[in-house]
């Protein structure tokens, strides 16, 4: 069964429940993105309905109840691949637009939760065993390094910054809990610094990062450096910086149009120079979507230029899609992939993408979306696949903290002496 619930932006989304004959159930909620790539699974919404300004999901919910539920009756929840394959076949489209990627994903994840509950094991252990079916050499579960949003721009905030997220990574922390304390300390120092400089130090974007109207993208990075130092930590040694440029959303098909410092139209090569200059000047160790999703030639040149110095993460470029990832591997485009469950639409396809990335030596970052809920599945997924990083958002807003707190509990379990 399914129902319409609300996400962190007040938009409807799909919650699904899977019930077994033994009385066990699993529940999951599909997230939703603001900054979306063209290759993502289709999010089915009631666009012709005035409810929620055309963003309702009653049709997706109806598809779960009237089409998906009867088709899955009799399946064992332990048969994740069989369930997901049936969902894909039932939809019949390339991008899951018939049933809705949001409907399909909610059912896929709820099935996994029901299976874990049936086995009486934590979700991350169940997901790890599913992943081991693909990758017999999979590393054991581990808690990933958080990649945390400090300043928001682009489509995640109402300011003038072109880049979408300015983030930090507590690389020098001895434990996940210590790293989380560093992050909170830096976040608070950043708010004080912004207020002291006459900027808004309380307004936050969709993912909890501050949303000030700064003079430039570079100034945002400079504020991060100052906040790290104000927290008595060392930039580049204790804490590094990451960027989510989300450049697809200011690419007009020919040029990258930047507005933070006045109207600029940059070619692909000029955009590469902007990225190279930032990496030269600051301890930036990860850049997500520095070029547009179909600028394959530019990505190849950028990877040749910076790939040995920093993680170049494909989000819109790959859309958690194996076919796009395989093209990137062939073309030597990027060296990491962002993993978002709702980009591809089923758990099995997500695990397959992680497997292909790992086999090719690509890094992978498990990520939330801007429209999130109390669902914590991505925390378990990141641990299960031994992801290098997890990108949840900032350390405010309860839909983000639910996932950070889930990781604290998992860390206790993993680190507890046997």
Describe the function of each predicted region.
Residues 1-13:
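Short, Gly/Pro- and small/polar-rich lid/capping loops
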Residues 6-9, 92-111, 146-158, 204-205:
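Glycine/serine-rich anion-binding loops at beta->alpha junctions
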Residues 14-22, 29-32, 148-170, 226, ...:
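Short beta-strand elements
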Residues 132-133, 141-205:
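Mobile "lid/hinge" segments at catalytic clefts and subdomain interfaces of large enzymes
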Residues 165-176, 201-217, 249-261:
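Active-site-proximal beta-alpha loop/turn segments in soluble metabolic enzymes
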Residues 200-201, 218-418:
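Catalytic core of soluble alpha/beta enzymes
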């Amino acid at each position: 069964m399914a129902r319409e619930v609300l996400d962190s932006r007040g938009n409807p989304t799909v919650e699904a429940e899977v019930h077994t004959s033994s009385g066990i159930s699993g529940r999951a909620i599909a997230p939703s993105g603001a900054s979306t790539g063209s290759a993502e699974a289709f999010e089915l919404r009631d666009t012709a309905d005035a409810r929620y300004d055309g963003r309702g999901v009653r049709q997706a919910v109806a598809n779960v109840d009237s089409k998906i539920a009867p088709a899955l009756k009799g399946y064992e929840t332990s048969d994740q691949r069989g369930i997901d394959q049936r969902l894909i076949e039932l939809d019949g489209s390339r991008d899951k637009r018939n049933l809705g990627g949001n409907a399909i994903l909610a059912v896929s994840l709820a099935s996994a939760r029901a299976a874990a509950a049936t086995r009486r094991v934590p979700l991350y252990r169940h997901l790890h065993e599913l992943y081991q079916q693909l990758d017999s050499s999979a590393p054991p579960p581990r808690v990933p390094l958080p990649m945390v949003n400090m300043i928001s721009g682009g489509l995640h905030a109402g300011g003038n910054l072109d880049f979408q997220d300015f983030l930090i990574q507590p690389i020098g922390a001895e434990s996940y809990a210590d790293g989380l304390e560093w992050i909170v300390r830096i976040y608070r120092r950043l708010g004080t610094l912004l207020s002291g400089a006459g900027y808004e130090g309380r307004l936050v974007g969709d993912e909890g990062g501050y949303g000030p109207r700064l003079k430039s993208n570079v100034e945002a990075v400079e504020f991060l450096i100052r906040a790290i130092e104000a927290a008595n930590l060392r930039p580049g040694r204790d804490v590094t910086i990451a960027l989510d440029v989300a450049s697809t959303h200011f690419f007009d098909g020919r040029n990258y149009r930047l507005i933070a410092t006045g109207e600029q139209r940059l070619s692909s090569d000029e955009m590469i120079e902007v990225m190279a200059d930032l990496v030269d000047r600051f301890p930036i160790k990860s850049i997500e979507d520095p070029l547009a999703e179909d600028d394959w030639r530019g990505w190849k040149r950028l990877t040749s230029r910076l790939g040995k110095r920093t993680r170049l993460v494909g989000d819109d470029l790959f859309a958690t899609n194996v076919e796009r990832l395989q093209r990137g591997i062939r073309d030597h485009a990027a060296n990491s992939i962002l993993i978002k469950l709702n980009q591809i639409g089923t758990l099995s396809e997500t695990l397959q993408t992680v497997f292909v990335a790992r086999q090719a030596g690509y890094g992978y970052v498990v990520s939330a979306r801007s429209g999130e809920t109390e669902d914590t599945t991505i925390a378990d997924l990141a641990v299960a696949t031994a992801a290098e990083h997890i990108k949840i958002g900032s350390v405010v807003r309860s839909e983000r903290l639910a996932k950070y707190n889930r990781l604290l509990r998992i860390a206790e379990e993993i680190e507890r002496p046997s």
